[in-house]
Amino acid sequence: MSNVPAELKYSKEHEWLRKEADGTYTVGITEHAQELLGDMVFVDLPEVGATVSAGDDCAVAESVKAASDIYAPVSGEIVEVNDALSDSPELVNSEPYAGGWIFKIKASDESELESLLDATAYEALLEDE
């Protein structure tokens, strides 16, 4: 079973979301998602300043197996991207919940968080796959 940190929120598309002290949210893909994709070779990051809606594809993770869209779990403005992934996309594999984060977003509608899964619900989703 993949590591599913209890303090994070999850989307059904295997993104995770963590609230930061400054009120922004950090987004990445789950350990389960990176295991399915395999070794990352490139991450196409969103543009800082871009406005996205929940469910929009806003980044792409390319691995040796496939390219997979990464979706915005909430609506808002992209305020930061993980530039380290340009040189080290493998961080998504080795540190999916730490150094392998993809982008940070300033949520425009925090009520959208209610539609995300907690760790228990995400683990149940994984068991059904």
From Swiss-Prot:
GO terms for cellular component: cytosol; glycine cleavage complex. Keywords: Lipoyl. Pfam families: GCV_H. One of its GO terms (biological process) is glycine decarboxylation via glycine cleavage system. It comes from the Bacteria. The modification N6-lipoyllysine is found at residue 65. Binds 1 lipoyl cofactor covalently. This is Glycine cleavage system H protein.
